[in-house]
């Protein structure tokens, strides 16, 4: 009886602080709807109907503060653990099959954009396991929740919500039916809505850009994305290297854009591979395993991959998976 009473009191107390309401109840949402009508010519009644189907939780600010200060950040996964998730035999085998089934489209993308087939396939493998896992979360609900909830990136997600609604209108997609990742990323390539609108391409010339079902469009769009971020055709991506203790300060823990060229590093006393020209820009990163660390020399194309996902672990997984895919695919020819 005592436990039941305590549970009831907790429920009542929580209800005071958190109230679930249709998103149209919130002034910030109404302001957004009006802006979409005025700026992009949306039908207000249609937007009101769509937004009314999505509920938001109204949270008391004092409770929000207590909740946020009591949350511990998740420790970053080691490179060894990260790699074990994405660079696997299963993902390699499935990737080779995907490559074989889409060989012509991949060759066309490589010819047009200069991005190797292995890199495109690796990104598709890591993002969605070659389209098998595109996300189960209703995208409109995800974006509204982040755009008008307690997210620290509300402005970013309001822009993505705007792009999502425009994307749905431009491609005759039902906003309430679309599903994606928990961050609002969409389709085979996991483009956020703004990237979908800007970088996605109709690669099979069927007059429709479809990243949900069309592998050719996904292939071309990934290649176009990297090309737009200055992918360098036939250039290197990364090389494992070693630095002595006096050179450790050159290593970046976070993403490092290659700014200094090989000549600069050589003049500082670093032994750079003689096959690398003096004018090639380089950076150094460190990847931590549970018991050790790896130092890598990275080139512009490594940085270009981090424009897809801003994480050194991600870029290195793409690179290493691509190397395994290329080796295995070549052996089947």
Regions found by a protein language model. Give the residues of each.
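Functionally critical loop-and-helix segments that line ligand-binding/catalytic clefts
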Residues: 190
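Cell-wall glycan-active module
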Residues: 1-9, 14-179, 184, 194-333
